[in-house]
Regions:
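N-terminal secretory targeting modules
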Residues: 1-71, 174
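Homeobox/homeodomain signature
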Residues: 4, 8-10, 37, 106, ...
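Short low-complexity stretches enriched in small and charged residues
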Residues: 25-28, 80, 163
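A broadly tuned preference for mixed-charge, low-complexity surface segments
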Residues: 28, 70, 85-105, 173-188, ...
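Residue-level detector of flexible, active-site-proximal loop/helix-junction positions
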Residues: 47, 73-76, 168, 215
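Conserved SGNH/GDSL esterase-like catalytic core that processes O-acyl groups on lipids
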Residues: 49-140
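Alpha-helical cap/lid subdomain in secreted, periplasmic
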Residues: 109-218
Length: 218
């Protein structure tokens, strides 16, 4: 499992390296070009947690030490739940931060407002709960609302909002949401890809981290 997560994390590492070395051609807000420090915050659930956990090690191995990372985590959290927690300013999240390629726990009772407002984040990565990742109707109006809130809280008004595309459940998974996709990994993956394409186009998100495709191609 650790090897799988390391492989999936290459997508996040690629985002960091490309942002540090190249300019995005058509961003919703420009990714910074060769910044002195790159700041990336992931807002999500275990898929964000798993997707970023080993990133400091990959950055360290690549000799990159000017990246600040944050992961704001609540188990199974959907776009709708993020918005509901924020409306109540509820301290539901665990907030981890890496400033020298080493994770530390900032808070085990953080709010969305606190974590997003903690740094001048350059990139804000969001995702949908895996259970609903292939269900188009679960995204609206919650994705638009979450984007609006993280933009409001972020001290960097020009932060780029990016999308993490989650992966499909494996064959034989006993996840309670798998029947939504007829217990078929290929059907779920196709739905996730299709919905990700639609909602990112609708919301102007042009930076997509394809962890779902990375896992699918293992």
């Amino acid at each position: 499992m650790k090897k799988l997560f390391r492989f999936a994390l290459c997508a996040f590492a690629l985002l960091a390296v490309l942002t540090l070395r190249a300019q995005s051609e058509a961003p919703n807000f420009p990714l910074p070009v060769r910044p002195d420090t790159l700041r990336i915050l992931g807002v999500g659930n275990s898929f964000t947690d798993d997707g970023m956990m080993y990133l400091p090690e990959l950055l360290e191995a690549a000799g990159i030490r000017n990246v600040v990372l944050g992961r704001l985590y609540y188990p199974g959290c959907s776009l709708r739940q993020h918005c509901e927690f924020d409306a109540a300013d509820a301290p539901k999240y665990t907030y981890y931060k890496s400033e020298r390629n080493r994770w530390t726990t900032v808070s085990e009772a953080a709010t969305l407002r606190e974590a997003v407002g903690d740094e001048r984040w350059d990139v804000l990565v969001v995702q949908q709960s895996s259970a609903y990742s292939g269900i188009y109707t679960s995204y609206h109006p919650w994705l638009e609302r979450l984007i609006e809130r993280v933009r409001f809280y972020c001290p960097n008004a020009g932060a780029c909002v990016a999308w993490q595309m989650t992966w499909a459940y494996g064959s034989g998974s006993d996840h309670g949401a798998f029947p939504k996709y007829d217990n078929d990994p290929q059907q779920m993956y196709a739905a996730v890809v299709d919905v990700a394409r639609r909602v990112t186009e609708e919301c102007g998100i042009e930076t997509v981290i394809p962890t779902g495709t990375a896992i699918q191609n293992l």
